[in-house]
Amino acid sequence: MTNAEKLTLAKHACHIRMGVIEGTHSAKCGHPGGSLDIAEVLAYLCFVEMKVDPKDPKNPDRDRLVLSKGHAAPALYAALAERGFFPVEDLKTLRKIGSYLQGHPNMNSVPGVDMSTGSLGQGVSAACGMALGAKHAGKPINVYTILGDGEVEEGECWEAFMFASHYGLSNLCVMLDRNHLQIDGTTETVMNSAPLEEKLKAFNFNVLTINGHDFDAIESAIAAFRAENEKPTCIILDTLKGKGVSFMENSVDWHGKGPNDEEYAQAMQELNAAYAALEEEDK
């Protein structure tokens, strides 16, 4: 990947983070922490990797993206808006009465959303069904699903992993957001799921652990997924919850609340400065 390409993706990721802050500030609620930390992977999927068309969001031959950690909907909405599925201005209607941008993704109302999610563990299960369906149909469709590391405390995730392995779903890419925080504290103290890499390998997954904020690493890991033709892949994304907003970073306090006016102003100042630095670097 060239430096110019990485800069372009970094700008998209910055816009996604701005969208997260705009939406959760307007709503006065939501989940900014776990939304901010998946900006890079969403930017890469939406602008580089996935076969999608904002003008034809229901194309049966499109790749699929399932946000299994559905509470991170602000990031998914911001990414879809950035990609052109709907107006960026609509992000400010997040969680409002009458808005199509609900607190969790709704496949029946939001263009570009492939599965309604929110109940943890169910998204990855649906993604398995999509991948198996594509296999049976003989279609070259890849299915990507983003999970949280708190989410994998749900037993349904492991049933889905067993299913994916049993059916050899090599077209399924599980992207596990490993930020080590969940609503009640650290994942290590609430319910330690480590060692995740070894456990997933025992479930016969192709497993890679990468820096989830590094575009080169994301590109290489997805290339490894595409090269695998016998078993499902899990890319463990080592991330920083709240990435990009200093006072939200690595803080469980920002799992599930929106910024007030003062916090919003500070967050946007930081993100605008980050974007300006990218623009300067791109000259």
Regions found by a protein language model. Name each.
Residues M1-I16:
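N-terminal hydrophobic or amphipathic helices/low-complexity stretches enriched
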Residues A13-C29, D177-N179:
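N-terminal capping segment at the start of a domain
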Residues Y77-A79, N106, E156-W158, D184-E188, ...:
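Short acidic, glycine/serine/threonine-rich loops at helix termini
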Residues F205, F215-K283:
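Glycine/aspartate-rich loop-and-adjacent alpha/beta segment that forms the canonical ThDP
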